[in-house]
């Protein structure tokens, strides 16, 4: 009988560590709701003790996610576990995930401790976590380089202390698949109480073996796989969840396991994570790359036309990729736009129809036909920028040529006031940015600039993603338009609004702190 493999997503915790700019609470919630819709069993959404922002993110997601178990990370430290529990207590169901290093190298050089002390600490902290929840996961950091006898001792002790899931990470992506399978098999042979916990694996891709190691572990008896959408994560990344999920589905004949994932949501979730995290998906990426279902060889094309199974082991439709793209025009009404969004699987709560339709009409007037990928791009950008704006791009004009210095004139609405400036720059985009900086007097440093075509051909939309540095903090902005300079300007305005909102939040926190201090003095 087929057994279920629990899918544990860590996109918002381990995955986010790879990003150049931290995600906002709103962006994290968007991803969390998409993961819930996809059907992940557990989502690890942050490290609450690390910052007030992470605490708020975990708490917000814990409050809103209902159908997936929400998890937070904690070191084997009392405060970590207490803060994690505090952030999670609003959840329908939650898990505390605590960890400590177990390899001789980590114990000696990082912890400056002994294996016996590590075991004692693990027991104490697992018991502390069990005071808050019956669902406690314990991880043996660097398990891949831990002698099996030592690892078995730690695992047995953690289970006796109350851990319900034991995670075996290949923290540095060092282990070969046959070795990793041997570790899992070895634990089943050596740990007498192993039947009282789920064995989980968490692999990294430093040698390109994360997915292979996870599948080898599943074949050896692991029943939870941890990973991130699109494989994002530190260094070379985490195990790509979409790859493991589809491998389990396609090769159920030899693995004899299944997941509870809604496979039709894989494509959408992957695209959303890519866009929000500003991490483009390589064309040759398995499962979700733009070339994953493309056939250029004449022999292959002929074979696919005769029978898709000749060269396709899965279909685009099996991951929710609809290859039939319909187009709308400026004559299409609101009902037609809503109907198409419904057909693509979007709920009304995921976008603002009024804003989407306004943006759709402007785009349709410019390019004539609007395709599915255009609508999705407009909906995504609208969601990112739907919060109140202090800055708004009112007008811009650029002049440049092969022998001319680029000049830009920009008019920007700043609250109730409209300001205008002109500036020169190293190209039209830089000129626009210089003019915007003059208007706002923000000393914004551009760290990263990327341009992605959304759609096909000469009428494709250009999405600009930028990462900026302002007062020691990283801010991400995104802009979308048929004109690249306009996209770039909108991305910078998005950054400015994010900076302004962050400053307003800081002012409010200071006001509350001062209010509390005044109350103490009164008492």
From Swiss-Prot:
One of its GO terms (molecular function) is manganese ion binding. It is an enzyme of class 2 (transferase). It catalyses: 3-methyl-2-oxobutanoate + acetyl-CoA + H2O = (2S)-2-isopropylmalate + CoA + H(+). Its EC number is 2.3.3.13. Its main location: cytoplasm. It comes from the Bacteria. Homodimer. This is 2-isopropylmalate synthase. The lineage of its organism: Bacteria, Pseudomonadati, Pseudomonadota, Gammaproteobacteria, Enterobacterales. The gene is leuA.
């Amino acid at each position: 009988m087929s057994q279920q493999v629990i899918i544990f997503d860590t996109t918002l915790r381990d995955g986010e560590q790879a990003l150049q700019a931290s995600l906002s609470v709103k962006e994290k919630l968007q991803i969390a709701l998409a993961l819930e819709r996809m059907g992940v069993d557990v989502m690890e959404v942050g490290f609450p003790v690390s910052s007030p922002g992470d605490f708020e993110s975990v708490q917000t997601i814990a409050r809103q996610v209902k159908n997936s178990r929400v998890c937070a990370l904690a070191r084997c430290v009392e405060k970590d576990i207490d803060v994690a529990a505090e952030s999670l207590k609003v959840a329908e169901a939650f898990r505390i995930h605590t960890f400590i290093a177990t390899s001789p190298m980590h114990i000696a050089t990082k912890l400056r401790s002994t294996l016996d002390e590590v075991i004692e600490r693990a027991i104490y902290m697992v018991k502390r976590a069990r005071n808050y929840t019956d669902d406690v996961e314990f991880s043996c950091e660097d398990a891949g380089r831990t002698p099996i006898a030592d690892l078995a001792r730690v695992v047995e002790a953690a289970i006796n202390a109350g851990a319900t899931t034991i995670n075996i990470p290949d923290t540095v992506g060092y282990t070969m698949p046959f070795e990793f399978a041997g570790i899992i098999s070895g634990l089943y042979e050596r740990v007498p109480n192993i039947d009282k916990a789920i064995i989980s694996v968490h692999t990294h891709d430093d040698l390109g073996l994360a997915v292979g190691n996870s599948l080898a572990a599943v074949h050896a008896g692991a029943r939870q796989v941890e990973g991130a959408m699109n494989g994002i994560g530190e260094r070379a990344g985490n195990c790509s969840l979409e790859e493991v999920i589809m491998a389990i589905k396609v090769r159920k004949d030899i693995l004899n396991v299944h997941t509870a994932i809604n496979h039709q949501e894989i494509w959408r979730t992957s695209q959303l994570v890519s866009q929000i995290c500003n991490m483009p998906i390589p064309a040759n990426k398995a499962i979700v790359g733009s070339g994953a279902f493309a056939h250029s060889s004449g022999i292959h094309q002929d074979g696919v036309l005769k029978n898709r199974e000749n060269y396709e082991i899965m279909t685009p439709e099996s991951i929710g990729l609809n290859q039939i793209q319909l187009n709308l025009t400026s004559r299409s009404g609101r009902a037609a736009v809503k109907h198409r969004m419904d057909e693509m699987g979007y709920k009304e709560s995921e976008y603002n129809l009024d804003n989407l339709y306004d943006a759709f009409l402007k785009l349709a007037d410019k390019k004539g036909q609007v395709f599915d990928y255009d609508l999705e791009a407009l909906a995504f950008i609208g969601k990112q920028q739907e919060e109140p704006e202090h800055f708004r791009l009112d007008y811009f004009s650029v002049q440049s040529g092969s022998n001319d210095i680029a000049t830009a004139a920009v008019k920007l609405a700043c609250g109730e006031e409209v300001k205008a400036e002109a500036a020169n720059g190293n190209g039209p985009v830089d000129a626009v940015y210089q003019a915007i900086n003059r208007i706002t007097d923000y000393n914004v440093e551009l760290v990263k600039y990327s341009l992605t075509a959304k759609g096909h051909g000469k009428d494709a939309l250009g999405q600009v993603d930028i990462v900026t540095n302002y007062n020691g903090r990283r801010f991400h902005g995104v802009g979308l338009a048929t004109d690249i300079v306009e996209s770039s300007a909108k991305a910078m305005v998005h950054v400015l609004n994010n900076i302004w909102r962050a400053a307003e939040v800081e002012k409010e926190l200071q006001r509350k702190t001062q209010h509390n201090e005044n109350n103490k003095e009164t008492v």
